């Protein structure tokens, strides 16, 4: 008899997700699965889904921060599609990235052409200067 049956065997370490290893909130494993299933390439490297998840997380955080600011400017505590639209269209780079995207229930940016505004007369200008 060897007597090894009662000794504590090797306990398996707690599983650590690739998202937590990379310090991300977005699911690296799911992104990897979608890259494999999407027929983008025959093979997918180990770093590609981590990088893509990080980029998606950064863009999401950027849009949500700007939308939160837009909601706060409108004295609201909940972000609605209108706030997302205002956030994206008022940011030059995000507007370029999402130029062809329609946000449902987003509305349009308030804009009045300068030629449609009433002309300032001389009497109004002199009254303001006094």
Curated annotation (Swiss-Prot):
Residues modified to Phosphoserine: 2
N6-acetyllysine PTM positions: 6
Compositional bias ranges of the Basic residues kind: 7-19
Residue(s) carrying N6-(2-hydroxyisobutyryl)lysine: 6, 10, 37, 75-76, 96, 119
Any one Gene Ontology cellular component term annotated for this protein: nucleosome
The keyword RNA-binding appears for this protein: no
A GO molecular function held by the record: DNA binding
SMART domains xrefs: H2A
Gene3D superfamilies in the cross-refs: Histone, subunit A
PROSITE patterns per the UniProt record, alphabetical: HISTONE_H2A
A biological process term (GO) from this entry: heterochromatin formation
Residues bearing PTM N6-lactoyllysine: 10
PTMs per UniProt: Monoubiquitination of Lys-120 (H2AK119Ub) gives a specific tag for epigenetic transcriptional repression. Following DNA double-strand breaks (DSBs), it is ubiquitinated through 'Lys-63' linkage of ubiquitin moieties, leading to the recruitment of repair proteins to sites of DNA damage. H2AK119Ub and ionizing radiation-induced 'Lys-63'-linked ubiquitination are distinct events.
Domain of life where this protein originates: Eukaryota
Chain positions with N5-methylglutamine modification: 105
Positions of post-translational N-acetylserine modification: 2
Main location: nucleus
Family: Belongs to the histone H2A family.
Record's function text: Core component of nucleosome. Nucleosomes wrap and compact DNA into chromatin, limiting DNA accessibility to the cellular machineries which require DNA as a template. Histones thereby play a central role in transcription regulation, DNA repair, DNA replication and chromosomal stability. DNA accessibility is regulated via a complex set of post-translational modifications of histones, also called histone code, and nucleosome remodeling.
Complex formation: The nucleosome is a histone octamer containing two molecules each of H2A, H2B, H3 and H4 assembled in one H3-H4 heterotetramer and two H2A-H2B heterodimers. The octamer wraps approximately 147 bp of DNA.
Protein's name in the database: Histone H2A type 1
Native source organism of the sequence: Xenopus laevis
């Amino acid at each position: 008899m060897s007597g090894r049956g009662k000794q504590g065997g090797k306990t398996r370490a707690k599983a650590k997700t690739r998202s937590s290893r990379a310090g991300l909130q977005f699911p690296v494993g799911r992104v990897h699965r979608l890259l494999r299933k999407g027929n983008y390439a025959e093979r997918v490297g180990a770093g590609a889904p981590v990088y893509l998840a990080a980029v998606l997380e950064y863009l999401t955080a950027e849009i949500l921060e700007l939308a939160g600011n837009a909601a706060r400017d409108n004295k609201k505590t909940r972000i609605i599609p209108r706030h997302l639209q205002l956030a994206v269209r008022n940011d030059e780079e995000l507007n370029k990235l999402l130029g062809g995207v329609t946000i449902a229930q987003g509305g349009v940016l308030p804009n009045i052409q300068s030629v449609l505004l009433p002309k300032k007369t001389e009497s109004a200008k002199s009254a303001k200067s006094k």
